[in-house]
Amino acid sequence: MVQKFMSRYQAALLGLGLLLVFLLYMGLPGPPEQTSRLWRGPNVTVLTGLTRGNSRIFYREVLPIQQACRAEVVFLHGKAFNSHTWEQLGTLQLLSERGYRAVAIDLPGFGNSAPSEEVSTEAGRVELLERVFQDLQVQNTVLVSPSLSGSYALPFLMQNHHQLRGFVPIAPTYTRNYAQEQFRAVKTPTLILYGELDHTLARESLQQLRHLPNHSMVKLRDAGHACYLHKPEAFHLALLAFLDHLP
């Protein structure tokens, strides 16, 4: 009788333990968001190469699968990243499948691009981007600029905004180097992207970027500074919506 009671007691404890394990499992966060969920098309060839000149810049490029190119998009990168980031995320391939030509470059000293004294000055950084665009025959482009690359993109925007079809800053640096009046003079269509959990650069850059007269803004929830890594699907949706509606 005692043994029968003990076996029932042990079975009850085992059942309770299994229930607790199940509840704990159900409460755990799900797997990371898939980075290629939006890209279901055929394989896309990612071309690579080096620009000409003294400061040779490594780049990755995809051409539109469709014959007609809807627009050209150039991707810069942040301090901890390089052009490969945009291939790993599937961003380049996705844009190719949607009819865009997309180019991602390694800034000097990152990835496969050698360091260059030229980019130690603002004028040198602008000249570098101008030369890259010319060498790759990029015209009327959309420039995507996260974080550190703001020190390249912002000076270029201020001097050559008439050459850009669109601008996508993602919590960029260098915004404090310009006055509100300078931002108001830029008419380029702009998509301001930032992560909800980025309480440093995003907040600082927004104070200035919001003065761009032709801008829209998207906050990616539960994402930090590198919001495109934390929420790639939401990032791709916002980017494509912006690109698809450019004049």
From Swiss-Prot:
* The keyword Iron-sulfur is annotated on this UniProt entry: no
Look up and give the membrane topology term: Single-pass type II membrane protein
List the keywords (alphabetical).
Cytoplasm, Glycoprotein, Hydrolase, Membrane, Signal-anchor, Transmembrane, Transmembrane helix
Residue numbers annotated as active site: S147 (charge relay system), D198 (charge relay system), H225 (charge relay system)
GO cellular component labels: cytoplasm; membrane
One Pfam family it belongs to: Abhydrolase_6
Sites where a glycan is attached: N43
Q: What is its main location?
A: cytoplasm
Record InterPro entries: AB_hydrolase_1 (IPR000073), AB_hydrolase_fold (IPR029058)
Transmembrane regions: 11-31
Broadest EC class? Answer: hydrolase
Q: What does the UniProt function comment say about this protein?
A: Possible role in granule neuron development.
Mind telling me what this protein is named?
Protein ABHD14A
